[in-house]
């Protein structure tokens, strides 16, 4: 599972004409492998709540308006999750995020969600950066590939990207 921060398929934007498909690789992978769309609980912030809902199947709304289960319950105790379920079926589970491990308490939370390992940016090779300073997703993809190469098990890999995070240009395309 790869969660792409702030991603939108540019082909869905009406009233623009593109010279070529900017997401042809993604569409090819989506056609070849299991993929789908998901409705997320947040807009303009709170990526961790989307992560929480995907991994646990629980709504973040159950934990109060404006709350972050990662910073409250999930940082304090084990929470039933996809990682625990798949562990019982013999899977190894790895979570990765190309941002700081302490942000949203991910360094603790992923252990409480049943992941065997969590790899934050601090444990990755030095990444290229976006113009606004976020780590590019190439470092995340490299780490995912390293995990896949190094294991013979069935794996649950949950990668959370940050490359698409704001700020965003405020000028308009003519």
What are these language model-derived features?
Residues 1-4, 8-174:
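Solvent-exposed soluble domains appended to multi-pass membrane proteins
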